Amino acid sequence: KNWIFSFILVSSILVYFTIEKNNKEINVAILDSGVNTEHIKQNITTINFSADKHTKDSHNHGTAISNLVIQNITKANLYHLKVLDNNGESTPSNVEQAIDWCIKHNVDIVNISFGFPKYNYKISKKLDKLIENGTIVIASSGNNLGGKSDFPASKSNIISVGGLSKDFKISRYSSSGKIDIYNLSENIESINNQGKRELFSGNSFATALTTNEIIKMKQS
């Protein structure tokens, strides 16, 4: 059943977005709350753009997201750009700096498992430049209980991800509006910031799973 769902997911992505294959190592960036690298099997470079003085994941979000994004990925340079602080909060300036870094370092795929309730002009323009360079950006539509999608997932040139329950129904807390892909979002098993297995729920994790599939598509 999950294999069939993965096939449908990949087919849906191909309908709306062009994924150019690349047999070489690709650059993958995860914008989130930091990562406790000792709990991640793959090597991952961390860079801090938050107000914190470290790249550790005190919010118990970025480690789980990173683990899902990069599971079973081998030919990739992995980067975690910490833009969320220990409370899971960020500023537009933090995100702008991280996007500039992605542009400068020719990142191929960017995962954004969070969002802002309001549109931001500067972030939007920087994302446009990033995408014009060929970068694929995947973002969470938010957990807004049927409300409108968060920014930047609401942008037309970004792959916006909504959530599904285990029986493949739209999750009760999933956002509506502009959503390109739905993926599983409830009771997703990953690694927490203490290195233990934990079940997580939310469109953040549906986004991470979708990014993982897109990385595999690009490398297939």
Outline where the language-model segments fall.
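Active-site core segment of subtilase-fold serine proteases
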Residues: I19-Y79, Q97, D167, Q194
